[in-house]
Structure formats: structure tokens, C-alpha cells
Regions:
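Two-component histidine phosphotransfer core
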Residues: 1-119, 124-126
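C-terminal end segment of the histidine kinase catalytic
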Residues: 130-140
Length: 140
């Protein structure tokens, strides 16, 4: 998890430079052990989707929130961004390939209990993953 988080933060530092004040970030990941297993390039594509579909189209930008927790052997991670209900009328340019790829990799590694859930509620778009896994011991 630590390496995945560092990669995501590096990516966002570039996007923050590009988008400026339009991109607001909120991280709630303190409960996630640094050694937790997560496939490489899982978080970054979720963040990229949040920026492309939730921040870039909005003149005022918005808040991307990353929430992660590890409890009772289950890891949950949600990336959310602003969602405009009127956007459903516009044709999507995306192929959902990143989400399909993440879902397939989670299933292959963590089995049928692994889930990727995408939903819209309360003016936000949520991409959430949940899977059982063992946490590696924290390094001193």
C-alpha cells in the first residue's frame, strides 16, 4: 500500500500543478497499514478517472476524496469526486477499460469476494473496491 500511495501522490502532484486551485484533495487513509497488499496501479487509474470525469469538466473544479480502511482482514478503498447529473445526457468518451482491468485483477488475486462498486449518490461519483487480504507487519 505504501508504494501505491506514493505513486498516486506523485501523480496528483503533477495534476495539482496543472489544475491548480480547481483540484482539492482529501485523504482519509491513516487506518491502512503500509504493508497492505494492493495490486500495482490500482489507485492511480481511479484518481485519473475522478479528474477526467469529475474535475476537468467543471469550471470550479472540486474535491477528490480518497478514503481507505482495513478492518477484520478486509480492505476498503473509495475514491469520490463531484458528479453532475446532467452529465448523463452527454456521451461518454470512456471505455471503462481501467475499471474492468482493476476488477479483473482484484478477482484473479483475491478471489470472488473482491468487489469493485461504482455508484452515484449525493452529488458524488464513487469508485470503491473491497477485498479480503492479510496485512503485512508494519516496519519499525
Amino acid at each position: 500500500w505504501r508504494e501505491e500511495l506514493e505513486l498516486a501522490q506523485s501523480y496528483l502532484s503533477i495534476e495539482k500543478y496543472r489544475l491548480g486551485e480547481r483540484l482539492q484533495l482529501e485523504w482519509q487513509v491513516d487506518e491502512v497499514p503500509g504493508g497492505l497488499l494492493i495490486p500495482q496501479l490500482t489507485l492511480q487509474p481511479l484518481l485519473e478517472n475522478a479528474l477526467i470525469h469529475g474535475i476537468q469538466p467543471r469550471i470550479d473544479g472540486g474535491l477528490v476524496r480518497v478514503e481507505g480502511r482495513y478492518r477484520d482482514g478486509v480492505f476498503e478503498l473509495c475514491v469520490s469526486n463531484p458528479y453532475d447529473p446532467g452529465a448523463e445526457d452527454k456521451p461518454s468518451r470512456g471505455t471503462h477499460q481501467a475499471l474492468l482491468n482493476i476488477e479483473a485483477r482484484l478477482g484473479a488475486i483475491f478471489g470472488p469476494q473482491a468487489r469493485l462498486i461504482v455508484e452515484r449518490r449525493d452529488g458524488r461519483h464513487f469508485s470503491c473496491l473491497r477485498y479480503p487480504c492479510a496485512s503485512l507487519p508494519q516496519e519499525a
